[in-house]
Every structure is written in structure tokens, then in C-alpha cells.
Amino acid sequence: MRYKKIHFAFDKKNDLILQKFKLFKKFKKYSPRNSDLIVVLGGDGFMLEMLKKFKKFNKPFYGMNAGTYGFLMNKLKNNNLLVNFSKSKIVTISPLQMIAKTKSNIVKKEIAINEISILRQGKQTASLQIKKGKKTIMKKLVSDGALVSTPAGSTAYNLSVHGPILSLNSKKLAITPISPFRPRRWRGSVVSDRSTISITNLDTRKRPVSIVADNVEFRNIKNVKIFVNRKIKFNLLYDSKNSLNKKIKIEQVRKEIS
């Protein structure tokens, strides 16, 4: 597909982007609403912000990396941009949806492209119960927390806490403990992406926890339900030689070797 109306969203805090942005000034400016493609210049964190910020416009996104790793991004290129955009392949992903309730019974809702993490809020470990539907997966997990990861996010925080890498087409979610103390050997669980996962804080008074959806945090959480929201779809564009699925496979090989 040929993309002509481009909206550029760039991280103004990124020095590399500020240096390179003059290369994109030749393009006519379009608002996100009137564009047919949103190009995001920055790192993974900025990409996640822009996906959420502009999701209401239902436009495809093409990320160009100026961050540290840029797993969700393409390489930052200067030449033949319109050709690169038109030749790129679309990957469609749906985010996780969290519906959490605080200790004060206030409902908090947020989506996450990578993962939703429940984390201890103070010096004491968290005490969590985890269910898949009505089935109890873990009656009591004493740990620094737990997370639920999508395939797209499985090589991020999930991998750093020894969670499994999921193929993009696996139709699975990873439930991964963070520094588990009891049971010490529990490595988590891989479940269908049709599952609804419930996590309850068993001791809100002595062991408060927060919840983080990608980069959005809520504190003093009592319980949360997490599921894939299929009503929301993000279309991400990737260069044919730099596909998201290829990146995930590379990480799988690295994990097997290490």
C-alpha cells in the first residue's frame, strides 16, 4: 500500500531524533486524524505511548528506532522512506485490558501492549492469588509480584524475569512470577489468550501492591482482571527484513544458547 499522508510523532527528549528530524521536514504535515500513516520516531517506550494516544484514529503505525533496543521499531533510515513504508508488512495485535479495583474500591481501567505487572509497593513481599477463569493456578504466591505478558511483550520485562518467549501467532499469554519466594520453584504458566486472568492481593493492609500497564501505574490495588481486548486492534508496519516475528525468533535462539 502507498502511504502519502504522513503524521510524524517524535520524542522531543531524544537528542538523536532532534538531529535527524530535519530530514523529515520535506514532508507535508498532516494531523493524526487526516493522515494515512503515523510514523513514530523514538524508542519502545515512546512507541507504546503513541499507540495509546492515537489509537482512536485507527491508523497504521511505523516505528523508527532512536532508543536503546527498539524491539517494536524499525531501523532509523534517511533514504527512500515512502518506498520503505509502502513495502512494509502489517502485523495486527490486540492489547491486554486490565480492570482493577483499589483498596478504596475505585475501578481503574487501562490497556497494555507488552505486559501488565503487579508489583510489591513497599519493603514486604506481595502475597497474591492467581486464577484462570474459575480455576486457581496459584493459591498463594509470595514474591515481588507477577506479570501477564502478550507474545509481543514476551521478550521485554517478561524475559528479564525468566518468563517464556511466545511466538507472535501462539495465541498464548505468559503468567510469570517476579522473584518468587514461595513456592520458590514455580516458573509461571502459559495460558490461552482467550483466558481471563484474575489476580488478588491476599493482604492489602500489610502488603500493598501497585499495578503497571506498560508504563501507566496505579497504586494500592486489591484485585485485577486481565484479558485480551479484541475490540482494539493496532496495525504495526515492519520492514520485510526486520519483522516482529523474526525478532522474537532471534530472541528465542539467544535464550536457548545462553
Where do the model's predicted regions map?
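Short glycine-rich anion-binding loops that position phosphate/pyrophosphate groups of nucleotides
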Residues: G43-F46, G67-Y69, A152-T155
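ATP/NTP phosphate-donor binding region
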Residues: M1-L37, L41, F46-K56, L76-T92, ...
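ATP/nucleoside-binding phosphotransfer catalytic cores, i.e., glycine-rich phosphate-binding loops
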Residues: E110, I118, K134-M138, W186-S258
